[in-house]
């Protein structure tokens, strides 16, 4: 099925990558999807043979046209309007999930291909020798691989995953479905209390394996239910872009403290000059590369360097930082659509260098 063509101001445009290729996929097809970067368009005449093509390089003319389009809509809204969108951000997301409930996004089975760290074949239990080696590498820092804080959800787990911005569970439930490891525990949080209520009301929600909670990752005073240095993986899928740019660094710093030494942060988000950015009309710009959608939710479009600076400043080292330039095709209408996403893996440094 080809990717839909919808109005530029619709949140569907911004959220089309929920299947990573833009086309709707059933679960079996999604799990078989090859990793990004394996389907290349070598003959432009064959563009309509598939729904999507990987690593499509832009011409200088395309880059120039994209920059011009962004500059045309670069006049920011008045400060009082920006403050309103910031103060009412949770209301807009609650309204979004009240309207759409669990019908808007597809389950993200493609994540197991792009991020094998989430796949069930991963070995989550550290051997005694590896644990001893990691503790030695901490050079005497007051950090334990098994935090001895008061009891917390998932305290007995051997492998802990946190998804920030979980929505209605389109990442969490595929993880729980496919991973029967008794040592696995998944945390998930969202800014929207409506979204978290929908997660908890899902028949597949199991409090013995999962803990859902409301949390604003940009709130410095907000508490997480797990202690620092307790998480193996943190997942950020199209969520960091919803924050005000000035709040991003402190939010990542806080998440970094939750990771165990050697733990990883996985991100996929909107890239600079993505089709969604170029389709914004005048009167939607909040600040440079930061916009408000018609429903009041906000979105930022990143470069690789911006994300690298955010993560490295939080003490994380790069494992992967790539641009996914995807040419999506609507074969029925003979249309081409250029998507740009950034995908990152960053690891918490084991010891000071």
Swiss-Prot record:
**InterPro entries for this protein:** Methyltransf_12, METTL2/6/8-like, SAM-dependent_MTases_sf
Residues annotated for S-adenosyl-L-methionine binding in this entry? 93, 97, 165, 190, 216, 237
| GO cellular component terms, semicolon-separated | cytoplasm
Where is this protein primarily located? cytoplasm
**rRNA-binding as a keyword?**
no
GO MF annotation list: tRNA (cytidine) methyltransferase activity; tRNA (cytidine-3-)-methyltransferase activity
Task: Write the record's keywords in alphabetical order, separated by commas.
Answer: Cytoplasm, Methyltransferase, S-adenosyl-L-methionine, Transferase, tRNA processing
The protein's location, in the record's own words, is: Cytoplasm
Provide the residue span(s) of the region labelled Disordered. Answer: 1-37
EC number of this enzyme:
2.1.1.-
Q: Name one Pfam family in it.
A: Methyltransf_12
The UniProt catalytic activity note for this protein reads: cytidine(32) in tRNA(Thr) + S-adenosyl-L-methionine = N(3)-methylcytidine(32) in tRNA(Thr) + S-adenosyl-L-homocysteine + H(+); cytidine(32) in tRNA(Arg)(CCU) + S-adenosyl-L-methionine = N(3)-methylcytidine(32) in tRNA(Arg)(CCU) + S-adenosyl-L-homocysteine + H(+)
Q: Which biological processes are named by the entry's GO terms?
A: tRNA methylation
Q: Which Gene3D superfamilies match?
A: Vaccinia Virus protein VP39 (3.40.50.150)
- Which family does the record assign? Belongs to the methyltransferase superfamily. METL family.
What binding partners and quaternary form does the record give?
Answer: Monomer.
Explain the purpose of this protein: S-adenosyl-L-methionine-dependent methyltransferase that mediates N(3)-methylcytidine modification of residue 32 of the tRNA anticodon loop of tRNA(Thr)(UGU) and tRNA(Arg)(CCU). N(3)-methylcytidine methylation by mettl2a requires the N6-threonylcarbamoylation of tRNA (t6A37) by the EKC/KEOPS complex as prerequisite.
What is the protein name for this chain? tRNA N(3)-cytidine methyltransferase METTL2
- Gene assigned in the entry: mettl2a
């Amino acid at each position: 099925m080809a990717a839909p063509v919808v109005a530029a101001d619709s949140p569907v445009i911004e959220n089309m990558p929920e299947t990573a290729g833009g086309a709707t996929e059933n679960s079996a097809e999604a799990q078989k999807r090859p990793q990004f970067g394996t389907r290349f368009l070598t003959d432009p005449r064959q563009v309509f043979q598939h729904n999507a093509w990987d690593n499509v390089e832009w011409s200088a003319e395309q880059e120039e046209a994209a920059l011009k389009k962004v500059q045309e809509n670069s006049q920011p809204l008045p400060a009082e309007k920006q403050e309103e969108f910031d103060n009412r951000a949770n209301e807009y997301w609650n309204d979004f999930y009240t309207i759409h409930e669990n019908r808007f996004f597809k389950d993200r089975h493609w994540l197991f291909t792009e991020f094998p760290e989430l796949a069930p074949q991963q070995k989550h239990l550290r051997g005694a020798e590896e644990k001893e080696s990691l503790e030695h590498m901490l050079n005497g820092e007051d950090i334990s691989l098994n935090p001895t804080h008061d009891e917390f959800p998932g305290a007995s787990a051997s492998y802990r995953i946190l998804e920030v911005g979980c929505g209605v569970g389109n990442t969490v439930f595929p993880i729980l479905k496919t991973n029967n490891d008794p040592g696995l525990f998944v945390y998930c949080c969202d800014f929207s209390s409506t979204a978290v209520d929908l997660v908890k009301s899902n028949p597949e929600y199991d409090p013995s394996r999962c803990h859902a909670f409301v949390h604003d990752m940009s709130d410095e005073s907000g508490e997480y239910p797990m202690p620092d240095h307790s998480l193996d993986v943190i997942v950020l899928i199209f969520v960091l872009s919803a924050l005000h740019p000035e709040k991003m660094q402190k939010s990542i710093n806080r998440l970094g403290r939750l990771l165990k030494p050697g733990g990883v942060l996985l991100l996929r988000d909107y890239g600079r000059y993505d089709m969604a950015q170029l389709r914004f009309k005048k009167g939607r710009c909040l600040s440079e590369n930061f916009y408000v959608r018609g429903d009041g939710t906000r979105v930022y479009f990143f470069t690789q360097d911006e994300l690298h600076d955010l993560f490295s400043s939080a003490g994380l080292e790069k494992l992967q930082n790539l641009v996914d330039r995807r040419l999506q095709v609507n074969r029925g209408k003979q249309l081409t659509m250029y998507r740009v996403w950034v995908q990152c893996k960053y690891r918490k440094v084991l010891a000071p260098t």
